């Protein structure tokens, strides 16, 4: 059944279905303008870099945390123990930003340095621990329907299958598995990683994804604020198309003009 309501994650409602990352921008100004143009409400921050990002500035001080909901992530963690420790630190940083009730964490456990693929076993282990500690866990995973269902069953707030490897810009490479995850999930499905252009963001939403998380496609564009706006439009268009319902594909043509009662 199609959900026409707002995006609901961990008991909190969001109007925007586009989450945006804060890494890789050439300047703080580019980042701030991009966040604004994207109309996002949720922004991810790497806990290990929040006090010294690529621009050398403190994100806690540069971002208006009354406007954006912080999604701390455990980027850089290679096992479950590290991820749990960084998640706890991230929750404290959210409190320092004024978000006392924020228990969100984007769970990333990535020992693979070349392709940055997430470790399914360590992700599951960390998720179980963090859920018991009261976190709303948003796990970054491969497009694995069985793992996605298992994470849902233990209480994760969303599942976040990758479209393709982080920062690769290859788009959605495993449409079949992503479709199975979307069809089977009873929690929001957020496509994370690999989206490079607005059409790919739209494609994810047309499939029925509940949202997308994008960083590199915006931050590394020639004009990040403009790309943020374009991707925002793509997400909205894809969502509307999904709700509207596309025509069925068929192997033959059907005339769009009536064939009967034609006056000459």
UniProtKB/Swiss-Prot annotation:
It catalyses: [ThiS sulfur-carrier protein]-C-terminal-Gly-aminoethanethioate + 2-iminoacetate + 1-deoxy-D-xylulose 5-phosphate = [ThiS sulfur-carrier protein]-C-terminal Gly-Gly + 2-[(2R,5Z)-2-carboxy-4-methylthiazol-5(2H)-ylidene]ethyl phosphate + 2 H2O + H(+). Signal peptide: none annotated. Pfam families: ThiG. Pathway: Cofactor biosynthesis; thiamine diphosphate biosynthesis. The keyword Transferase applies. The active site is at residue 106. GO terms for molecular function: thiazole synthase activity. Keywords: Cytoplasm, Schiff base, Thiamine biosynthesis, Transferase. GO terms for cellular component: cytoplasm. CDD domains: ThiG. SUPFAM superfamilies: ThiG-like. One of its GO terms (biological process) is thiamine diphosphate biosynthetic process. 1-deoxy-D-xylulose 5-phosphate binds at residues 167, 193-194, 215-216. It is found in: Cytoplasm. InterPro entries: Aldolase_TIM, Thiazole_synthase_ThiG, ThiG. It comes from the Bacteria. Its EC number is 2.8.1.10. Catalyzes the rearrangement of 1-deoxy-D-xylulose 5-phosphate (DXP) to produce the thiazole phosphate moiety of thiamine. Sulfur is provided by the thiocarboxylate moiety of the carrier protein ThiS. In vitro, sulfur can be provided by H(2)S. Belongs to the ThiG family. HAMAP family: ThiG. Homotetramer. Forms heterodimers with either ThiH or ThiS. This is Thiazole synthase.
């Amino acid at each position: 059944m199609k959900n026409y309501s707002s995006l609901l994650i961990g008991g909190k409602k969001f109007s925007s279905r586009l989450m945006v990352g804060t890494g890789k921008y050439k300047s703080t100004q580019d980042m701030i303008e991009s966040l604004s143009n994207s109309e996002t409400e949720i922004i991810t921050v790497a806990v290990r870099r929040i006090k010294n990002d690529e621009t050398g500035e403190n994100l806690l001080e540069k971002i208006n945390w009354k406007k954006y909901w912080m999604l701390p992530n455990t980027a850089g963690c290679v096992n479950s123990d590290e991820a749990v420790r960084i998640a706890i630190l991230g929750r404290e940083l959210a409190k320092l930003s004024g978000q006392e009730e924020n228990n969100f964490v984007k769970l990333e456990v990535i020992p693979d340095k070349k392709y940055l693929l997430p470790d399914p076993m360590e992700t599951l282990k960390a998720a179980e621990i963090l859920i018991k500690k009261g976190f709303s866990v948003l796990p970054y995973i491969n497009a694995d329907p069985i793992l996605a269902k298992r994470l849902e069953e233990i209480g994760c707030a969303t599942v976040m299958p990758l479209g393709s490897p982080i920062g690769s810009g290859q788009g959605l490479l495993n449409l079949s598995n992503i479709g199975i995850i979307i069809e089977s999930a009873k929690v929001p499905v957020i496509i994370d990683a690999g989206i490079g252009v607005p059409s790919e963001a739209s494609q994810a939403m047309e499939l029925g994804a509940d949202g997308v998380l994008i960083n590199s496609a915006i931050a590394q564009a020639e004009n990040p604020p403009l790309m943020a706006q374009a991707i925002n439009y793509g997400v909205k268009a894809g969502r509307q198309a999904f709700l509207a319902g596309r025509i069925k594909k068929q192997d033959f043509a059907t005339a769009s003009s009536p064939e009967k009662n034609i006056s000459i």
